[in-house]
Swiss-Prot record:
Pfam families: Na_Ca_ex. Keywords: Antiport, Calcium, Calcium transport, Cell membrane, Glycoprotein, Ion transport, Membrane, Phosphoprotein, Potassium, Potassium transport, Repeat, Sodium, Sodium transport, Symport, Transmembrane, Transmembrane helix, Transport. Calcium, potassium:sodium antiporter that transports 1 Ca(2+) and 1 K(+) in exchange for 4 Na(+). Required for learming and memory by regulating neuronal Ca(2+), which is essential for the development of synaptic plasticity. Residues 415-439 have a biased composition (Polar residues). Residues 99-120, 306-336, 397-439 are annotated as: Disordered. GO terms for molecular function: calcium channel activity; calcium, potassium:sodium antiporter activity; symporter activity. Residues 105-120 have a biased composition (Basic and acidic residues). Residues 1-38, 154-178, 226-243, 287-497, 555-569, 624-630 are cytoplasmic. This is Sodium/potassium/calcium exchanger 2. Belongs to the Ca(2+):cation antiporter (CaCA) (TC 2.A.19) family. SLC24A subfamily.
Length: 661
């Protein structure tokens, strides 16, 4: 038995040395593991610098005004040229039916800020104390809430939604467009609710618009830059999602023309989302029909194979060989990216060093904790890969014997995915023989364990071994521990029956974290002279989209460019057709069907700018010949920087919106 295992390990070592199967080599250093974090930090720094730089004038003027007497009111400010930078003013006196916000509390007099005073508790620090350095605590708290929202969504909310879809028997396409989209966009949705009912400002709309641009431009740019190879995109997923998104944006622009949102307009936007869900139900059938109509007159060239298959008797004598590394094919929809198997939580990335840039070691696209495995675990992991490839090889050989084909392409469905193909192509020279089939005795029990490993890993509070991980663990422990105590982890088989508690409990925690995030963002903006709308367009939009950014980069590095692009657009469809109209509809129902005031020329221009950026994205992808290369990545970053600069200039009234309503 020892000789047999030694022979198997030697074979595994040779297999790992093969260049075509280098997926299980540990060749990533700590420096490369931190590469993504450094790049994200660089771009977030650029966003913050660009935001602050264009608000210096407003900051200095606000500081001058704050040192005056408390008798200075907003009327003289207007006479002195002090502008109010806001996208949405629900307190517009022209609209008699709009409720007025509560009066400013003591210590928060009108001379201290030009922001809309929402229903926030009184800050323990005064405005002067915050400007002298206390605002750093608010910035840290806001970033802390970004991490908290990511953890509660990825570790509890999305897994509970996965259980719900399994209980209801919903297909992956529909689940991805409904429940999983809600899980990924929950922070934006609750930010919109808080903006309508609590903040009485446009922070929710600004966050959704900014998140939409971030997903389209920044996420696609990161995927193009960090992909391992040039990814060829197919037209159908992009055409499908962009078509729905364009229609939704046009509807939104039309509804904004009269400065109010009626209840039936909100209902129409929700209906548009329902139509998208119905379409996703029949997505596969529609795609086949459309492609058949397009290719019905297309001439297909058929060539005979260059070599005939070996006779079955001769082939049976051959030793089994390992094929080349499986290559992931494109064609995935947004449903595949938003399931819990594909989403690698930020807690796992921070604590367990699950490198988002590392080569996938698991079977068919599942990242594993390879670095933290024991020697036995690593052996079982390699054995499971070899076992599955050997099983596919047996099916390939059988089909070749039956059909006489020289090469065979087998399509395999990824877990929780409906349209992602894996192409298994036998390799003639880049493979090592497995001698005497000795693997069969050592991996009989590995398959059952592999099936368990492929399930989403439950939350672990085990104490890390490295110092850096221990520091990170202590930082996030105040977030993780209350969640671990109050929410059952449905990824454990014994806790799956408690999924309703996890579902509603996660919603409660998301609401709390979103409220704290918006409140502290309001305090930061009030202190340095940046409106809530700019905070939503830049900082909040990027912070709430970081988990989707990491997931999209991981998927793009696996070769699934279509899945990353489609998910970026698909999540925006949910934000526009649910994240915005649902709070509006609830507001109109509560206030006896009174319309919601959106009297804002800046917001209208921001949505039009978003529409223009979407057209630029389509044009850029077409100019790059439907390939995700480095050039496309730099174009996306350039467009995102242009959007940030123009948005800030519009909010500061340095530029005037050319589109008037």
């Amino acid at each position: 038995m020892d000789l047999q295992q030694s022979t198997t390990i030697t074979s595994l070592e040779k297999w790992c040395l093969d260049e075509s199967l280098s997926g299980c080599r540990r060749h990533y250093s700590v420096k490369k593991k931190l590469k993504l974090i450094r790049v994200l930090g660089l771009f977030m720094g650029l966003v913050a610098i660009s935001t602050v730089s264009f608000s210096i004038s407003a900051f200095s003027e606000t500081d001058t005004q704050s040192t005056g007497e408390a008798s200075v009111v907003s009327g003289p400010r207007v006479a002195q040229g002090y502008h109010q930078r806001t996208l949405l003013d629900l307190n517009d006196k022209i609209l008699d039916y709009t409720p007025q916000p509560p009066l400013s509390k003591e210590g928060e007099s009108e001379n201290s800020t030009d922001h809309a005073q929402g229903d926030y508790p009184k800050d323990i620090f005064s405005l002067e104390e915050r400007r002298k350095g206390a605002i750093i605590l608010h910035v840290i708290g806001m970033i802390y809430m970004f991490i908290a929202l990511a953890i509660v969504c990825d570790e509890f909310f999305v897994p509970s939604l996965t259980v719900i879809t399994e209980k209801l028997g919903i297909s992956d396409d529909v689940a991805g467009a409904t429940f999983m989209a809600a899980g990924g966009s929950a922070p934006e949705l609750f930010t919109s609710l808080i903006g309508v009912f609590i903040a009485h400002s446009n922070v929710g709309i600004g966050t959704i618009v900014g998140s939409a641009v971030f997903n389209i431009l920044f996420v696609i740019g990161m995927c193009a830059l960090f992909s391992r190879e040039i990814l060829n995109l197919t037209w159908w997923p992009l055409f499908r999602d962009v078509s729905f998104y364009i229609v939704d944006l046009i509807m939104l622009i039309i509804f904004f023309l009269d400065n109010v949102i009626m209840w039936w307009e909100s209902l129409l936007l929700l209906t548009a989302y329902f139509c998208y869900v119905v379409f996703m139900k029949f997505n596969v059938q529609v795609e086949k029909w459309v492609k058949q109509m397009i290719n019905r007159n297309k001439v297909v060239k058929v060539t005979a194979p260059e070599a005939q298959a070996k006779p079955s008797a001769a082939r049976d004598k051959d030793e089994p060989t390992l094929p080349a590394k499986p290559r992931l094919q494109r064609g995935g929809s947004s449903a595949s990216l938003h399931n819990s198997l594909m989403r690698n939580s930020i807690f796992q990335l921070m604590i367990h060093t699950l490198d988002p840039l590392a080569e996938e070691l698991g079977s068919y696209g599942k990242l594993k904790y390879y670095d933290t495995m024991t020697e036995e675990g690593r052996f079982r992991e390699k054995a499971s890969i070899l076992h599955k490839i050997a099983k596919k090889k047996c099916h390939v050989d059988e089909n070749e014997r039956q059909n006489g084909a020289a090469n065979h392409v087998e399509k395999i469905e990824l877990p929780n995915s409906t349209s992602t193909d894996v192409e298994m192509t036998p390799s003639s020279d880049a493979s090592e023989p497995v001698q005497n089939g000795n693997l069969s005795h050592n991996i009989e029990g590995a398959e059952a364990q592999t099936a368990d490993e492929e399930e989403d890993q439950p939350l672990s509070l085990a104490w890390p071994s490295e110092t850096r991980k221990q520091v990170t663990f202590l930082i996030v422990f105040p977030i993780v521990f209350p969640l671990w105590i109050t929410l059952p982890d449905v990824r454990k088989p014994s806790s799956r029956k408690f999924f309703p508690i996890t579902f509603f409990g996660s919603i409660t925690w998301i609401a709390v974290f979103s409220y704290l995030m918006v409140w502290w963002a309001h305090q930061v903006g009030e202190t340095i002279g940046i409106s809530e709308e700019i905070m939503g367009l830049t900082i909040l939009a990027a912070g709430t989209s970081i988990p989707d950014l990491i997931t999209s980069v991981i998927v793009a590095r696996k070769g699934l460019g279509d899945m990353a692009v489609s998910s970026s657009v698909g999540s925006n469809i949910f934000d526009i057709t649910v994240g915005l109209p649902l709070p509006w509809l609830l507001y109109t129902v509560i206030h006896r069907f009174q319309p919601v005031a959106v009297s804002s020329n800046g917001l209208f221009c921001a949505i039009v700018l978003l529409f223009i950026m979407l057209l630029f994205v389509i044009l850029s992808i077409a100019l790059c010949k439907w390939r995700m290369n480095k050039i496309l990545g730099f174009i996306m970053f350039g467009l995102y920087f242009v959007f940030l600069v123009v948005s800030v200039l519009l909010e500061d009234r340095i530029l005037t919106c050319p589109v008037s309503i």
